[in-house]
Amino acid sequence: MHRYALKVEYNGAPFVGWQRQKEHPTIQGAIERALGKIAPGPHTIAAAGRTDAGVHAIAQVAHCDLERDWDPFRLSEALNYHLKPAPIAITACTAVDAEWHARFSARQRQYLFRILCRRAPATHQKGLVWQVKQKLDVTAMREAAALLIGQHDFTTFRSTICQAESPVKTLDRLDVNEVDTPYGREIHFDVRARSFLHNQVRSFVGTLERVGAGSSTPQDVARALALRDRAACGPVCPPHGLYLAHVVYDRPPFEAERSI
């Protein structure tokens, strides 16, 4: 068998998430069906992150195993042909050794969340950002975000249906940045960790948005973290501003990343 790493970009709006489901459209299901068009199946692919319904990806990483020795460029071209018209694209493909695993070899996952601050309805960016009508206090949001960095029990910031064995995670980065775009002022959250709890990033952003709006304070966030109580979390923000932006490996599979 030959193993191939795939870099995958997608708009998550039409899907109930990454993970295959029998009766609902998923990204994993679409890619496995495309593989079935070019090679005998069944096929099961693995991914670095199992994104939820409505969540997008700039650079999800997956791998597949095929009996035939494919040229990576031809494999990506064939998959992209059979994925149409779904909003999924294979943007890079490379052969990897059998020990390399898209999920278990990953050292860090990096997420981007976009908030668009403007009163007029979003048009071009609709479904790609979380739009809020008021200005947000970025300084206060940064102060609150800094309190979440490091190793903590994140019970407050995980879904009640989270299946992780432990709520303890190490958050490597939670940067809050203002960005001027042609569509208006955006606030970008750069969130990085080896792994995340279910709904953790969206819980962070929803809580920090309330700080930016003046409804709560950085001290409230510190208390919520210490309480280890889901009821102390702010509102979970919608999924459509969230992107899996990058996955870090000790041995980056894609040529362009090996010098980073």
UniProtKB/Swiss-Prot annotation:
Reaction catalysis annotation: uridine(38/39/40) in tRNA = pseudouridine(38/39/40) in tRNA
Which GO molecular function annotation, any one, does this entry have?
Answer: RNA binding
Gene Ontology biological-process annotations: tRNA pseudouridine synthesis
Pfam families given in the database record = PseudoU_synth_1
What is this enzyme's EC? 5.4.99.12
For the ligand (substrate), the binding residues are 111
Keywords from UniProt, A to Z, are: Isomerase, tRNA processing
Q: Where is the active site?
A: 52 (nucleophile)
Under CDD domains, the record lists: PseudoU_synth_EcTruA
**Source species, domain of life:** Bacteria
Summarize the protein's role. Formation of pseudouridine at positions 38, 39 and 40 in the anticodon stem and loop of transfer RNAs.
Q: How does it assemble?
A: Homodimer.
The similarity comment for this entry is:
Belongs to the tRNA pseudouridine synthase TruA family.
Spell out the protein name for this chain.
Answer: tRNA pseudouridine synthase A
- Tell me the organism: Roseobacter denitrificans (strain ATCC 33942 / OCh 114)
